[in-house]
Amino acid sequence: MNFPKIISTPILGMSFCIAMLWSTGIFAGNLPLDPQHVMDADACGECHKESVQAWKGSHHSTTFKDMPRSQAAADIAKKMGIKRIKSESDCLTCHFTSAMVEEKVKPIAGISCESCHGAGANWIDVHSSFGGKDDTAETETAAHREQRYATSEAAGMIRPSNLYALAANCYGCHTVPN
């Protein structure tokens, strides 16, 4: 059956968008952030001081202390049948960063560096190694930088320059089915 272009183009477009969203895993109900591999923002702050300082003043960071006290969050939680915002997976998945603390999964921060860039335990050492003991980001060779980026990404880091992976990760929370 042939549909007129005016009908088939939007249908194809919507089908493509649904397929893209499905491929991000947003309908799976969880994100690929493994609490056993989460570090914390301090680990990132060793090199990215200004970024971590900016994050600490951001809505993403302050979610940890502000959201559980928010009336809007309490109203939403009540409608969803959630009693404790910091312990229900529907909230934890997007609004907090969880890590292993004393052999239990616990929220340690709001939406952190690792929420966007992936749990760091598997890639942070490679990401922060510039070649040799005395090498810095300024003295690192282009070949080493390229290899460092590739190895970090293969280990789970989501770099800002990888727009598809970054957007797919963002949409994991910013587009939800409920």
Regions found by a protein language model. Give the residues of each.
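Bacterial N-terminal signal peptides
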Residues: I11-G25
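Sequence context of c-type cytochrome heme-c attachment sites
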Residues: G25-A109, E114, G120-Y164
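Non-catalytic accessory/assembly modules
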Residues: Y164-Y171
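N-terminal secretory signal peptides that target proteins for export/translocation
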Residues: M1-T9
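Solenoidal tandem-repeat scaffolds enriched in leucines and small polar residues
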Residues: G172-N178
